A protein has these predicted regions:
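Basic, amphipathic DNA-recognition helix from helix-turn-helix-like DNA-binding domains
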Residues: 1-22
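Conserved catalytic core of two-component sensor histidine kinases
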Residues: 45, 78, 85
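Regular, well-ordered alpha-helical segments
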Residues: 1-5, 54, 93, 100
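A structural micro-motif at secondary-structure boundaries
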Residues: 21-49, 106, 112-117
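Short amphipathic alpha-helical recognition elements used for nucleic-acid or partner binding
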Residues: 34, 40-73, 91
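Alpha-helix N-cap and coil->helix boundary residues
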Residues: 63-67, 79, 83, 98-101, ...
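DNA-binding patch around the recognition helix
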Residues: 43, 86-88, 92-117
Length: 117
């Protein structure tokens, strides 16, 4: 299925605000585009980092693929909604679920950053 996102982009709105999110074993810093996982720096492309930051900024909130495309890729993205699935898969390969949090699939709906404690 192809999707054209509405003209809303998370990256333009938040990059300059100096924001970061922190959980046990995970720090995502949007200001300097860095991720620390279990004390180690993790390299990831900007869209993966923005996706992780966006999800982690709204813990336990479920987002559809379309909502994630709107916020991360913005209006210029014209393509398959499954690109979100690919980015989530790559994130999961780089940062494994923790006892305190997880990148969770909500079947039939989308994804969430689940805080377990």
């Amino acid at each position: 299925r192809r999707y054209q996102a509405a003209p809303v982009s998370m990256s333009a709105a938040t990059k300059q605000q100096g924001e970061y999110v922190e959980y046990p074993n995970l720090i995502v810093n949007l200001t300097n585009y860095s991720v620390l996982y279990k004390g180690h720096s993790v390299d990831m492309p900007p869209k993966e980092l923005e996706l992780l930051y966006f999800l982690a900024s709204s813990p336990n909130q479920v987002f559809t693929r379309e909502q994630l495309l709107d916020h991360i890729w913005g209006y210029e993205y014209i393509g398959d909604t499954r690109t979100v699935d690919v980015h989530i898969k790559r994130l999961r390969e780089k940062i494994r679920d923790d006892e305190n949090w997880a990148l969770s699939t909500v079947w039939g709906i989308g994804y969430k950053f689940e805080v377990r404690r």
